From Swiss-Prot:
Gene Ontology CC: cytosolic large ribosomal subunit
Biased composition (Basic residues): 1-16
HAMAP family: Ribosomal_uL16
GO molecular function, one term: structural constituent of ribosome
SUPFAM superfamilies from the UniProt entry: Ribosomal protein L16p/L10e
One Pfam assignment: Ribosomal_L16
Assembly information from the UniProt record: Part of the 50S ribosomal subunit.
Protein name from the UniProt record: Large ribosomal subunit protein uL16
Gene3D superfamilies: Ribosomal protein L10e/L16 (3.90.1170.10)
Taxonomic path: Bacteria, Bacillati, Actinomycetota, Actinomycetes, Bifidobacteriales
Amino acid sequence: MLIPKRTKYRKQHRPVRSGMSKGGNEINFGDFGIQSLAPAYVTNRQIEAARIAMTRYIKRGGRVWITIFPDRPLTKHPLGARMGSGKGAPEFWIANVRPGRVMFEIGGVSEDVAKEALRRAIDKLPMKCRIIAREGGDI
């Protein structure tokens, strides 16, 4: 699981989800990638599930890069707790993903294999995404 080694504060405010992504909008490492089309909070478990789906499909060929990191804690009160009594305990870690952000990249495999591996990863993510290529844009 992806979590920060240490943070300055245990609890944080929820990040703003509006607006387009200001950086990380292009493919830097691989040949193909997944680009988000809607804002969402992606949890560390969702990132891990997408990574496993891709790596199991490509088997030993190719390489996968994860370009987002869950650096924000999301807090939650226990089920059945009454309102009030402060902010809840940190429940899980999220990455704030805005539209246009490239989240995963894949390289070293053919276009057909990359397309299917990325499609399987998209099924694990909570927002609408598209598959893009380094030189051609949308596939």
